[in-house]
Amino acid sequence: MAIPKICGIETEYAIIQPKLSEQNPIHASSVLVNAYAKQAESSTNGGVAYTVEWDFNDETPGNDARGLAPIGSLPPLVETHLVNAVLENGARFYVDHAHPEISTPECIDALQVVKYDRSGERILELAMSVANETLSPEEEIVVYKDNSDGKGNSYGCHENYLVDRLTPFGEIITHATTHFI
């Protein structure tokens, strides 16, 4: 019998404002995520706004996979608080460097991952609609689920696996490498 595994994916999206001569994907991504988060807060719970906060009590985001924290390794505030929406379904919608990204909630099988990935696509559609309502036609935001913007920036979709924190890093490398190859 197979051991149940917690899994999920993170999908990176390309973003562009096609009518602008100069692109600022960080700003456009921030507008997109914030517009969706603000709309979701105001339309939830009978119109009473509330925010799901990111809890770092059991997290050390500055640590690498070995658990080491180099001096000055704290993530920028923008990666942890400013443009980061934890959604009601457990997914996360955020700006990852210079593009919008959605991570699924923890899932119990591949079918559930696919369902949440599809719901992420719908969230992006709604986010574009809400953001574009606040922008001029020249500032329209368009998001693509692809893997390259044609200017050297590439995007992707990556898997996530739950691993016990007590597992030695060398064991992860030994077994994960075999699994991925």
Predicted regions and their residues:
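Histidine-centered divalent-metal-coordination microenvironment in nucleic-acid enzymes
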Residues: N147-D164
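Inter-helical turn/loop segments and adjacent helix faces that build the functional surface
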Residues: L166-I172
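Terminal catalytic/cofactor-binding subdomain
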Residues: M1-Y144, N153, I173-I181
